[in-house]
Amino acid sequence: EELLRIEIESLQGADFDVSLTGFGEDEIADLFAGDGEKDVKDDDFDVDKALESETFVQPGDIWLLGRHRLLCGDSTKPEDVLLLMDGKKANACVTDPPYNCSYSGGTGMTIMNDKWGDSEKFCQFLLDAFKNAYENLADGAAFYCFHSDAEKCNFFNATVNAGFHYSTTCIWVKDTLVIGRMDFQMRHEPVIYAFKDTAKHKFYGDRKQT
């Protein structure tokens, strides 16, 4: 049974239609029933207490994660981005900036710079960050920016004014809708696709993507 579960799990990961195996949905569900709860051991870790503790990470700290570098810093400050890049240029930038809307999760914690209120200040905030991205990208590098429809003008203007060549807007279609206060509930997220046109841009797909 364990081997069967492993095989079906690998087929699911390969987007294979597992119904072709001859097992019905109920049989497969029974096979995986309780699998997520098995071997789960609770500990005495206090999440709330940990969140209240003073952090030892300070601005300017860089964490090395294998080949990757993670900076505690400000992407609107050129000196911070230069510190992160360490003299190198990136081949692509994928960014998901604040959407200029207040968000608070179940913990009540908020996101810094998440809500500006003033549209001009928010656009300048984006522009400062995007300019730094532009300066630290290689010639022809791609730029992807997840954003909200409500602020699409600011995101578009900041992208173009930073120097990028706007190409198109991709749509991320999500598996489920996101409940909000809007009349129509969103089930997608737009993504600006642009590139640094100081050289022919590089695209690594087969041009069949939608």
Where are these regions (language model features)?
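Core catalytic lobe of class I
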Residues: E1-T210
